[in-house]
């Protein structure tokens, strides 16, 4: 019986030390990971906005927390500025594609048009669902209107409020469409203030 207790105590001590070391490593790496994610988002918004904006600042933490509480798919919000003028907002949001969770960045301009779209992370099928990461797909978002509070999907988007749907990857492109429409009310809230 004593051997069982001794073995149990040894395992408990080893587990406690391992957990402590993991916590220490996590405390060092969490800031590095957060900074890398921030830089990846800013890079996406620099591509999305081009010369329409030159600064991307995180939205005030209290405002962001309120939005994230209300809109669960929102991960981050950026204020897009040209000089000191706010020209729009960038919203990172999640959705569920064919391969699982995806993270997208959408740039929304204060004139009611889309500055652009980029996929930040996905697990979609290579060559099919991953088309959402390619210029022929995301270039079609630029200038599309969301003035009516939503955008629509179409395989051949011609109307000002239609974004592309991909044949053979409808789940992926539907996830993008649903994600954008789900965060438009959040944009309305932050842009009205």
Describe the predicted segments one by one.
Residues 2-193:
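Flexible, solvent-exposed loop/hinge segments and secondary-structure transition points
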């Amino acid at each position: 019986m004593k051997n069982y207790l001794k073995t149990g105590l040894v395992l408990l001590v080893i587990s406690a030390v391992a957990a402590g070391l993991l916590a220490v490593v996590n405390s060092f790496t969490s800031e590095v990971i957060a900074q890398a994610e921030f830089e990846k988002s800013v890079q996406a918004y620099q591509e999305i906005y081009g010369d329409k904006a030159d600064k991307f600042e995180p939205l005030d933490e209290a405002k962001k927390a309120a939005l994230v509480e209300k809109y669960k798919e929102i991960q981050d919000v950026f204020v897009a500025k040209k000089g000191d003028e706010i020209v729009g907002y960038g919203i990172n949001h999640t959705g569920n594609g064919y391969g699982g969770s995806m993270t997208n960045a959408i740039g929304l301009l204060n004139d009611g048009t889309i500055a652009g779209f980029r996929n930040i992370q996905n697990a979609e099928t290579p060559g099919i669902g991953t088309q959402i990461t390619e210029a022929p797909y995301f270039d079609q978002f630029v200038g599309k209107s969301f003035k009516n509070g939503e955008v629509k999907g179409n395989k051949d988007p011609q109307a000002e409020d239609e974004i592309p749907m991909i044949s053979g990857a409808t789940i992926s492109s539907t996830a993008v469409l649903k994600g954008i429409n789900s965060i438009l009310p959040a944009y309305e809230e932050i842009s009205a203030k």
